[in-house]
């Protein structure tokens, strides 16, 4: 499902991420993330490891099956973005990229304010 794909992508992009961090990124409560993670563990996509800094916490890592899925998702997202981007007239592409950059910066600023 989509949520599991988002989890796989975030774990793939940030190996060692915690359930708490995933919950914050995806804006899902920790118990919901834990349930989705448990399902991914059962399917051999993800493993939990004790944190090296604090053994009371666990970190999440992709197993080979999860890594393969992550790479496929990233590949598919790249080509989908490329396909969409190519529909934009060439002389407008730089504007679109600039607008996306500004949008991303605004999202990060709002996210930063939400964490204060």
Where are the language model's segments positioned?
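Residues in the recognition helix of alpha-helical DNA-binding motifs
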Residues: 36
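N-terminal helix-turn-helix DNA-binding core of bacterial DNA-binding proteins
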Residues: 1-32
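Short amphipathic alpha-helical interaction/hinge segments
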Residues: 19, 74, 107-111
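Charged, amphipathic alpha-helical coiled-coil/dimerization segments
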Residues: 39-94
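Short, locally clustered residues in the helix-turn-helix/winged-helix DNA-binding domain
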Residues: 9-13, 74, 101
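Generic structural concept
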Residues: 4, 8, 63, 97-100, ...
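C-terminal regulatory/oligomerization modules of transcriptional regulators
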Residues: 91-116
